[in-house]
Amino acid sequence: MKEEFVKSSIIKYLSRKEWGTNLQFGALHDRGVDIKVRHNRYARYFLIECKGQGIGRGSNEVAFVYSLGQVISRMKTGGTTRYYYGLGLPEKSAKIALRRLPWQVAKKLLLYVFSCDEKGNVRQYSWQDLKKAQDFKK
């Protein structure tokens, strides 16, 4: 699954959820966040870093860790505008994120995980979803 497929699937998902004002997205080799979008009714932005499916065994783990590092390095502080952050990942990488990303960190950083399957269906996970998944594993 290519990064462009993940990105376009998430853009379609967000537009159905009333995110779409001032939509900006970069090409594969552009610098900056992959998707930046404003909520249609509120002064809130989503900044999302997307990754595609890798080939090797460890590539899903690498995609998660790399995207997390990229989105953290782009986080904005201060100001009155509220920013939400997201990791846009193929399903396999998203499952790793659900296990490995501490829900407390996701809550503090307003960080969400977007999981994209082979058909382009997207599921959004909040810190509450991470907490449930991690509590269930105990």
Which residues make up each language-model segment?
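N-terminal targeting/trafficking signals and adjacent low-complexity tails
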Residues: 89, 97, 127, 135-136
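Basic, amphipathic alpha-helical patches used to engage nucleic acids or provide basic targeting signals
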Residues: 61-77, 82
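Polybasic (Lys/Arg-rich)
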Residues: 112-118, 122-125, 133-137
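Conserved catalytic cores of phosphodiester-cleaving nucleases, focusing on short active-site segments
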Residues: 35-37, 44-56, 74
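Active-site-adjacent loop/helix micro-motif of nuclease/hydrolase catalytic cores
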Residues: 55-68, 95-98
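Nucleic-acid nuclease catalytic cores
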Residues: 75-119
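Acidic-basic catalytic patches of nuclease active cores, encompassing PD-(D/E)XK
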Residues: 1-31, 38-43, 78
